[in-house]
Regions:
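ABC ATPase nucleotide-binding domains
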Residues: 1-106
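Glycine-centered flexibility sites
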Residues: 13-14, 39, 87, 93, ...
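Glycine-centered small-residue hotspots that permit tight backbone geometry or close packing
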Residues: 22, 78, 112, 153, ...
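Alpha-helix C-terminal capping segments
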Residues: 57, 111, 119-123, 159, ...
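Non-catalytic connector elements of ABC transporters
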Residues: 116, 126-232
């Protein structure tokens, strides 16, 4: 109420954002357009609205178009999602299905936060060779593929510190950055000149510059062909 009689120039960025969201919600419109509506809000309010907005729109007989750079927000809202890259729609479909089966490597990169880990691999029988010296078992995802060169993609939450490993596929890297949020650890490591990211529950205080042994869940890997298209 205190904001109702104020002009836009008299409101802060966060207040303008909250007012715009409220106006969109109270209107009985058939089409609601929201362009990064949570971007200028403080952390606490942003998290509250992330939970509340899907509930508010669920009971509305309206089409909601929600633009965001956050994959987590797209997954939270569900429905259908279109991913854009350089002004081009790379994929459109059910949100959860797109996350599990991105059409190509560009869509996988857009729809992953932290960024999906990718590198070239060589499949030979039941073995994958990556970074020239690291060998992994092929895993379920690549078992039916012909021998040859592919690009592999593994999401950060499928890479864990060795103490938590439950599947094969180990490698070592030099720790570049560690991010501790209290409930999870995000570890950036240099592997063969590329930066890979591990995201796991709990606190894992790796020292910057130290060696870290990580394990990848190879069964969850995505395999892409020479043109970047998803193969398996």
């Amino acid at each position: 109420k205190p904001m109702l009689k104020r002009k836009p120039s008299e409101l802060s960025g966060g207040q303008q954002q909250r007012t715009a969201i409220a106006r969109a919600i109270v209107k009985d419109s058939d089409l609601i357009l929201l362009d990064e509506p949570l971007a200028n809000l403080d952390y606490k309010l942003r998290e509250e609205l992330r939970d509340e907005l899907p509930k508010l729109f669920a009971g509305r007989n309206a089409i909601v178009v929600y633009a965001t750079t956050e994959p987590s927000e797209a997954l939270l809202f569900g429905g259908n999602t279109a991913t854009l890259h350089e002004g081009r729609v790379t994929q459109f479909g059910q949100t959860s299905a797109m996350y599990r089966r991105p059409r190509d490597i560009v869509t996988a990169e857009v729809f992953s936060d932290p960024p999906i880990n990718t590198t070239k691999v060589e499949k030979n029988g039941k073995t994958l060779t990556l970074f020239g010296t690291i060998t992994w078992p092929v895993g379920a995802a690549g078992a039916a593929l012909a021998d040859g060169a592919y690009t592999i993609g593994i999401r950060p939450h499928h890479i864990t510190p060795a103490v938590q490993a439950k599947s094969s596929g180990s490698f070592q890297g030099r720790v570049l950055v560690t991010e501790l949020s209290g409930s999870e650890s995000v570890i950036h490591v240099d592997v063969g000149g590329k930066t890979w990211v591990s995201q796991s529950h709990g606190i894992h205080p790796f020292e910057v510059g130290a060696a870290a042994t990580l394990h990848a869940d190879v069964d969850q890997a995505l395999f892409f062909g020479p043109n970047g298209e998803l193969i398996s």
